[in-house]
UniProtKB/Swiss-Prot annotation:
Keywords: Aminoacyl-tRNA synthetase, ATP-binding, Cytoplasm, Ligase, Metal-binding, Nucleotide-binding, Protein biosynthesis, RNA-binding, tRNA-binding, Zinc. Belongs to the class-II aminoacyl-tRNA synthetase family. The gene is thrS. Catalyzes the attachment of threonine to tRNA(Thr) in a two-step reaction: L-threonine is first activated by ATP to form Thr-AMP and then transferred to the acceptor end of tRNA(Thr). Also edits incorrectly charged L-seryl-tRNA(Thr). Its EC number is 6.1.1.3. PROSITE patterns: AA_TRNA_LIGASE_II. It catalyses: tRNA(Thr) + L-threonine + ATP = L-threonyl-tRNA(Thr) + AMP + diphosphate + H(+). Residues 195-492, 196-492 are annotated as: Catalytic. This is Threonine--tRNA ligase. One of its GO terms (biological process) is threonyl-tRNA aminoacylation. GO terms for cellular component: cytoplasm. Binds 1 zinc ion per subunit. NCBIfam families: PRK03991.1 (NF003068). The N-terminal domain is an archaea-specific tRNA-editing domain that hydrolyzes incorrectly charged L-seryl-tRNA(Thr). Catalysis of tRNA editing is performed by the charged tRNA itself.
Length: 614
């Protein structure tokens, strides 16, 4: 950003004609202005300017104002100070943000001349040493992440509706809550240590891709099975909510010259992946919001259709700090099973949010874990809807940390983050839901009511199991806790890349092994055959390293008795049974979960050794 400040005895401007195809709308208040003893801030918004630049500009402008003592500050868009200008839509939003922040930090009157118009002006400069100053506003230290500074008030809210100061609450019965509070309120977090989850990720084919940007993973054939299973499961979950849901697909890049896209990006604030194409600036989506909202604005929606959801497993991008990147948890590219539910009003959104909340808690319980929750809430919602908030917390059946922020900053009034406490005793956000009162209007999404009048819906955002990779982190973290307790770690059978491995002791038993494999495969399960010329001990050890739930060893006795000898990873038991019995066990363990086919050859002798098994 470049600014030229002039302390003027008198200043007059008048808008004459459009300089842009879509200039800012003229009003009686802004089309012409007369000022005395005014600090005129001629401003060029440059490519890459953001909230941090605005904050620095505010500091510079107020520093000058404190020295020259004007009655008024006028922000005057002036493109001639720079050759590296931001797009018009982005420049306008930055100018509005500059105006807003100046108003919030000074008692002086602050005005802004209209953007996108040719204007005539007359200027009478005081002529003292500080009357004309030129400044270039930049943020040094490349790669700095810009975070919105907010005044927050923290409370502990219990299921019985009592509110406590976090410093005075008794955490003896709530150690997980204390870990979350220590981090969010007091800025304390355990230093961590060796995270076994990283080893588990690599074991199953989740690796960094060194030929891409930092924070991008590649997914081997074992990892693909896990990913596809969870993607399908996430769709099954949203279909079970009892409301109509539409599955869609779309693009992952959106033009920042579109006003709603830019406004949403500015609200997101930081960690944006941006790119230029043909002199236009695009942002890579950080969730499915952009595409779904862009689609919904073109739909004709009746009140009779509400509530309904729109769902996509969206490839999403966030420019996370390099030092914070973590396999399957903090990534620059990931997959988000993003559901948005349109509701008539806030009351309906609250009702549907309870259904979403129940499903979030139900899903984490299925893998033997529990969440500790952070409720981010606006001050208006905290004051006016306290009973509603207490009802949400009662359903948690556990105290929550509440963070109250000023109203009118974000698009949501309630943003609930669900954290696990991982094997290193650190909070890790997984699932979430939000009640959004702003994006319906921002993207001009409307529905028609009984009287034919148009309204903007209230929108619920939710990732019921979290991002796909973060759900996998939770699965592996659960296994890490098992190992920490001295148990054999495992993952649920429905997610195991290979659910059954058949090991014939000799090649002469291969025909029988193939018949057993065919029967299991026809029942819908993933099975392979270790036909390599390795020793039985090595084959069993290799299957154990892959955490295969059921290892079937076939020898002469099994062939003669038409049985199978099964080693069960979860219990470390070894049992002789018929193939149908194993199929019944698999059906029970994978009931209500998706069936995804094998992503590699059935015979191990046909497979190269992947990097993660080398």
């Amino acid at each position: 950003m470049r600014i030229l400040t002039i302390h003027a005895r008198k200043f007059h401007y008048k808008a004459l004609s459009q300089a842009l195809d879509k200039p800012e709308e003229l009003t009686n208040e802004n089309k012409e202005g007369f000022f005395e003893n005014v600090l005129v801030v001629f401003t060029s918004v440059e490519e890459g300017d953001n909230e941090k630049v605005v904050e620095k500009a505010v500091t510079e402008i107020l520093d000058i104002a404190n020295r020259v003592k004007p009655k008024t500050i006028l922000l005057y868009p002036y493109a001639h100070l720079s050759s590296d200008l931001a797009s018009p839509s982005q420049a306008l939003e930055i100018m509005k943000l500059l105006e807003q922040k100046l108003r919030g930090k000074t008692d002086l009157e602050v005005y802004r001349a209209p953007f996108g118009w040719y204007k005539e002006f007359m200027l009478d400069c005081y002529g003292h040493p500080l009357s004309e100053l030129s400044k270039t506003i930049r943020i040094t230290g490349g790669g700095e992440v810009v975070r919105r500074e907010l005044k927050k008030e923290f409370y502990i809210l219990t299921p019985d509706g009592k509110v406590y100061d976090p410093e005075k609450f008794n955490y003896d019965k709530y150690p997980d809550l204390k870990i979350l509070v220590d981090k969010e309120v007091f800025g304390k977090e355990l230093p961590g240590g060796v995270n076994r989850v990283n080893d588990y990720c690599r074991k199953f084919g989740f690796e960094w891709e060194p030929m891409s940007d930092h924070g991008h993973m590649r997914y081997g054939p074992h990892a693909v099975i896990i990913m596809e299973s969870i993607m399908q499961y996430s769709w099954n979950i949203v279909r079970s909510l009892g409301i109509p849901v539409y599955k869609v697909m779309g693009t992952n890049m959106f033009n920042l010259s579109e006003k709603p896209v830019l406004e949403h990006a500015l609200l997101f604030g930081d960690r944006l992946y941006e790119l230029k194409v043909d002199n236009e600036k695009f942002v890579l989506r950080y969730a499915a919001c952009h595409q779904q909202f862009a689609m919904l604005r073109d739909w004709i929606i009746s009140y009779k259709n509400l509530p309904f959801g729109m769902f996509e497993v969206a490839d999403s991008y966030r420019l996370e700090q390099r030092g914070e990147l973590n396999l399957c948890f903090r990534l620059r590219k990931f997959y988000m099973p993003d559901l948005h539910i349109l509701n008539r009003d806030l009351n309906e959104a609250i009702k549907i949010s309870r259904i979403v909340q129940d499903k979030i808690l139900e899903e984490i319980a299925k893998i033997g874990r529990k969440y500790v929750a952070l409720y981010n809430v606006t001050s208006d919602f905290f004051d006016k809807y306290r009973d509603i908030l207490i009802e949400f917390v009662r359903r948690e059946n556990y105290p929550v940390l509440v963070s109250v922020i000023p109203s009118g900053i974000y698009y949501w009034v309630l943003n609930v983050e669900y954290h696990i406490i991982d094997n290193l005793n650190r909070p890790r956000e997984i699932a979430t839901f939000q009640i959004d009162i702003g994006n319906g209007e921002r993207f001009n999404i409307t529905y028609t009511d009984e009287k034919g009048e148009k309204h903007h819906p209230v929108i619920i955002h939710t990732a019921i199991i979290g991002g796909i990779e973060r759900f996998i982190y939770t699965i592996f973290d659960t296994a890490a806790l098992m190992e920490k307790e001295g148990k054999t770690p495992y993952i649920p059978t429905w997610l195991a890349p290979v659910q059954v491995r058949i090991i014939p002791i000799k090649n002469e038993y291969l025909d029988y092994a193939e018949k057993v494999a065919e029967k299991i495969e026809n029942a819908g399960f993933r099975v392979d055959i270790d036909d390599r010329g390795e020793s039985l001990g090595k084959k069993i050890r290799d299957a154990g390293r892959e955490w295969i739930p059921y290892i079937v060893v076939i020898g002469e006795r099994e062939v003669r008795s038409n049985t199978i000898n099964v080693r069960i990873r979860r219990t470390n038991d070894q049992k002789v049974m018929v193939t149908d019995e194993l199929i019944r066990i698999l059906e029970e363990e994978t009931k209500n979960y998706p069936r995804v086919s094998l992503t590699m050859p059935k015979y191990l002798s046909k497979r190269p050794i992947p990097s993660y098994h080398a």
